[in-house]
Amino acid sequence: MEYLLSIDQGTTSSRATLYAASGETLATVSRPLVQHYPNPGWVEHAAQEIWEGQLACIAEAIAKAGIAPAKVAGIGITNQRETTVVWERETGEPLHRAIVWQDRRTAELTESLKEQGLEAMVRERTGLLLDPYFSASKLSWLLDRVDGLRRRAERGEVCFGTIDSWLMFKLSGGKSHLTDISNASRTMLFNINTLEWDEELLRLFRIPRGMLPEVRGSAAGFGHTSAQVAGAEIPIAGVAGDQQAALFGQGCFAPGMAKATFGTGAFVVMNSGARLGVGDGVLSTIAWQLPGEAVQYALEGSIFIAGAAVQWLQEGLGLIASAREVEALAASVSDSAGVYFVPALSGLGTPYWDPYARGVIAGLTRGSTKAHLARAALEAIAFQTLDAIRAMEKASGIALKELRVDGGAAADNLLLQIQADLLGVPVLRPRCTESTSLGAAFLAGIGAGVLDTSAIAAQWALDRRFEPQMERNLREELHRGWQKCVRLSLGWEKN
């Protein structure tokens, strides 16, 4: 039997899962990750804690499965994207805590660049919007604020990387300073047209070229683990950012195929093929590159508040005792009776990108109940997903035929039925909803030569299919009501 080890380093936890090449889960281990909030709007992780926790997960997962490390055909790495790490090249010691993708400390810098009229140039080269979300401004901040860091970086003594790069460096015993093309595309320093680090962007953010990792395809081979670190020299065979890995794990290999990951927030990603789609309000990014094949691009939508809207009903309003109760409460009424909830509790993402939007509850009458509000919260997740997908369809010129879903909230049958009704296409929930981890393992399988995409596509198994049951006229009427409420929320804090 061939074994594949998936390393899934996320925002709140580190995980290692051992799979058979068939996709069967043999063992999984996870550890929570401490969040550090040194100032309002700042979010940091201790890079050394990430490494030590991940290493412990790897050892425990292999031991739990009862196999020797040398039996692992390949390791796949997937990770929280954009999170920025700097470390000393010679010792591998972190030189600052990792600045997490959620961190907003560089908002002034990105606003200043927008005011200089540079967003169109950045968008054209990277597919991204000028926002603190991405790595470039975080790295620029570190170089300017950490004593002596810029000087040392210019001397070649400092490495920069996203979390995948940091883990590969440590796993290889300092031999591999690499990243994959999907993670590189999220730094705002990588040109997704030329597929190279962009010299003009490096000058704009004042980044020394020598601190950047070498970029490789997503299953191109990334060296081996050190035997001292992992107990054997195991090939590091596949790497992708978390959302790209989830798209791969869902078997979305053809242009127009899409997945939505429903968690605290939600991410919607559509495969746009070898063509780079560009559209208002959606991000253009690299999905992956397989050996001997052209780069595959993707369109991405970010929804800031999804499951967190349900959490707010529980913690903020006390309408439910636990998030698990929301489905039954929402199902106790046949519709939301005209109630809409725009959960812009921290602004709105795709396609509005308005940090000044604030939450709106509208359409209340004397007959409105907490059940109507619970249903409106589920509808809000589905409406936001609909808005993102419509923007993607416009950008790609491809009409969505079905939506594959994963993440914690994908267990909510009512949410998925509402989603199918509002989209007007089937929503498919797979048996395995750990698509991110599975996608990394599949990439490792390709890199190690034990899998191909046809074998992976054949492994995808359906748990349940949700067919749309709503008439088109009603769907469009409800969406018009949603858009009316969104307009109320936009710019609320600024205006």
Curated annotation (Swiss-Prot):
Q: Name one GO biological process term.
A: glycerol-3-phosphate metabolic process
Keyword field: ATP-binding, Glycerol metabolism, Kinase, Nucleotide-binding, Transferase
Which sites bind glycerol? 81-82, 133, 242-243
Q: Does the keyword Transmembrane apply?
A: no
* Residues annotated as transmembrane: none
Catalysed reaction(s) here are: glycerol + ATP = sn-glycerol 3-phosphate + ADP + H(+)
Binding-site list for sn-glycerol 3-phosphate: 11, 81-82, 133, 242
Q: What class of enzyme is it?
A: transferase
Q: In which pathway does it act?
A: Polyol metabolism; glycerol degradation via glycerol kinase pathway; sn-glycerol 3-phosphate from glycerol: step 1/1
Q: Which is an annotated GO molecular function term of this record?
A: ATP binding
Q: Which residues bind ADP?
A: 11, 15, 264, 307, 408
For the keyword ATP-binding, the answer is: yes
Instruction: Give the CC-aspect GO terms.
Output: cytosol
Residues that coordinate or bind ATP: 11-13, 264, 307, 311, 408
EC numbers, comma separated: 2.7.1.30
Describe regulators of its activity: Inhibited by fructose 1,6-bisphosphate (FBP).
What does the record give as the function of this protein? Key enzyme in the regulation of glycerol uptake and metabolism. Catalyzes the phosphorylation of glycerol to yield sn-glycerol 3-phosphate.
Family (UniProt): Belongs to the FGGY kinase family.
This chain belongs to which protein, by name?
Answer: Glycerol kinase
Species whose genome carries this gene: Geobacter sp. (strain M21)
